[in-house]
Each structure stands twice: as C-alpha cells, then as structure tokens.
Amino acid sequence: MLTRRIIACLDVTNGRVVKGVQFLDLMDAGDPAELAARHAASGADEIVLLDITATHEGRGTLLETVRKTAQRLFIPFTVGGGIRTADDAAAVFDAGADKISINSAALTRPELIEEIGSKFGAQAVVVAIDARRNATGAEVFASGGRKPTGRDAVAWAREAEQRGAGEILLTSMDADGTRDGFDCELTAAVSSAVQIPVIASGGAGTPQHFADVFLRGKADAALAASIFHFGVADARSLKAELAAQSIPMRLPC
C-alpha cells in the first residue's frame, strides 16, 4: 500500500473559515492563514482551501486570502472556488497555490480540465465532485451543492480522468459535517473506476473512520475539516493511530 495522505480542508466564505453539516448551517471556525499554519504544524500532509461561495456569487477566488495563507505554508496547497478559465487558474497559482481544484466550471465546460492541464500539468489539476446518494448510485451537484446535475458521480470521475485530471476530490454531501464516517462504498466505487488518486471527503469523526476509508474505501487520501478546526483531533496523533494499524503514513518528526 502506498503512503496515504491526511489533508486539512478550509471552507472559506467572506475571508473566514466556516463549517456546516451537509453544506448547511455554517459556523465560523477562524482565520484561514492561522488555521492552515496550525494544521501544517500539527502534521497535515496538505491543505485544501475552497472558496465555497465564489461560484454561487459569480465572482473570482479571494486571491488575497490565498496569498496570505500560502505565505504561512511549507506543504502542498490546493485552492478551489471561482476558477472558470486557465487565466483564473494562473492567477491562483501566482498567489501561491500548488494545485487548483475545479468543480462547477468543469461540469459546465469539461474541456477546461484539458486546458488547465495542458498549461500547468495534470498533477496540478484536481477535479472536485460533490455527490449525493440516489436510488441508482450518486448524483453530482454543482454550485456548492446547490444544483443537481443529473450526472452520475462514477461516470463523471471517469470522464475527468480521461480529460486529464490528476486527482479526484470526492465529497459525500450526505456525510459532510456529520462526523459519522466517510461514505466508503461511494469512495470505493470511484476509486475502483479510475487510476488517478482519489481524496475522500465528508464524515470524518474518529481515527477509525480514516482507517475504514483507506482500507475499505480504497482512498489515496482523506480530507477533514471540523475535527481539526475544533480540536477533536490533530494530524500527528491521527497518523500515529493509523500507522499502528499498518496503514502507511508520512509521520512528522
């Protein structure tokens, strides 16, 4: 088994980190740069910052927030939200991001994946998929989980890979913020359908939840927000517990 990654997520609106349950009832969690630095120091392998209202509000990414956060980091930094063109991606990279995440814009115009990948490399392109379970599998939602698309999550992940995505960030909308565990079945379905890394998101609450999504869900990385922001767990202790279960981790010194 390859080394698995623990990723801390910052959902940002109006320049502040927020966290809710199933994309609703958002609570303030703090300053993005401060939280990113804290999570990095505690052993997170990567930071993901998602400007969760940029698409819905029809604006670009909060570049100053990205810049201030990037200045505090020494680990890979992914930024998403409001990226609609290769030029938008370039501005986010210039602000300090190592990778960009695209979601709604890729659903509207899938060739955007190829455009950004050809310019910056597939390794820099993460396609984010927000999915909610239905009778036949899981449906992809756009615009921060507000708009159903009719697309099947597994089929869209396959297409994203074919178009040149370097990673998939899969969020279970049903599990998001619940701390009841990742959707291992959905994660395994997507992981088995593609060859690129899949990041599982939504539902982290205990170390065992991470172990389950790595072992049963076949995830390459697991992302969490509220358990890190509100002090339920930190990456260092989490990694130690996972390593004790023979799950390969990059352990902090």
From Swiss-Prot:
SUPFAM superfamilies: Ribulose-phoshate binding barrel. One of its GO terms (molecular function) is lyase activity. It is found in: Cytoplasm. Its EC number is 4.3.2.10. CDD domains: HisF. It catalyses: 5-[(5-phospho-1-deoxy-D-ribulos-1-ylimino)methylamino]-1-(5-phospho-beta-D-ribosyl)imidazole-4-carboxamide + L-glutamine = D-erythro-1-(imidazol-4-yl)glycerol 3-phosphate + 5-amino-1-(5-phospho-beta-D-ribosyl)imidazole-4-carboxamide + L-glutamate + H(+). It is an enzyme of class 4 (lyase). The active site is at D11, D130. Keywords: Amino-acid biosynthesis, Cytoplasm, Histidine biosynthesis, Lyase. It comes from the Bacteria. InterPro entries: Aldolase_TIM, His_biosynth, HisF, IGPS_HisA/HisF, RibuloseP-bd_barrel. Pathway: Amino-acid biosynthesis; L-histidine biosynthesis; L-histidine from 5-phospho-alpha-D-ribose 1-diphosphate: step 5/9. One of its GO terms (biological process) is L-histidine biosynthetic process. GO terms for cellular component: cytoplasm. Its main location: cytoplasm. IGPS catalyzes the conversion of PRFAR and glutamine to IGP, AICAR and glutamate. The HisF subunit catalyzes the cyclization activity that produces IGP and AICAR from PRFAR using the ammonia provided by the HisH subunit. Heterodimer of HisH and HisF. Belongs to the HisA/HisF family. This is Imidazole glycerol phosphate synthase subunit HisF. It comes from Acidobacterium capsulatum (strain ATCC 51196 / DSM 11244 / BCRC 80197 / JCM 7670 / NBRC 15755 / NCIMB 13165 / 161).
